[in-house]
Amino acid sequence: MLDMRLGNDSDIPFIMNLVRDGITSGAFFYFGGKGFETVKSELESVTRKYRDNIPIGDYLFVFDAQLKREPVGFALLTGRNDFAGRASHLEIRMFAVAADKQGKGIGKNMLTSIIEATPGHRLEASCLPPSIKMMKLLAGSGFKLINTTQGGKKTYRFVD
């Protein structure tokens, strides 16, 4: 079982290790050499706004193993607007499980927790071609493929 909570400053080193692994594997991609620092800055901004009670459209969820109380994964969701500027859906921008915890159903539990925590929101996720595990996880959790770019990036949408 997992506990889902909002991330805080002390989670950033754990998350950045997973981001580094994701960049290495090709699951995450950022332009330029400063991509890693850009992600860190973005995460720090989100946790600072949480700490200061500033409303934002981003959700940084951290998932802890219940018995050990240690983080095993995270997800960053971002609110997206339509052309009129209205909130239209949430995008799962980043999603990762610690390498030593993969293959144990943790990703499935994390995704289920996200779905349950965001009722009434349209959820979407995009995957780069190397993200085969994530594509399978999404497809097996009620997400349907809605778009594939020429570069192979696939976008999925949750369907009840």
Give the residues covered by each predicted segment.
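Conserved acetyl-CoA-binding loop-helix of GNAT-fold acetyltransferases
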Residues: 97, 103-116, 136, 140
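Hydrophobic pocket/interface hotspot
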Residues: 15
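Conserved GNAT acetyl-CoA-binding A-motif
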Residues: 118-129
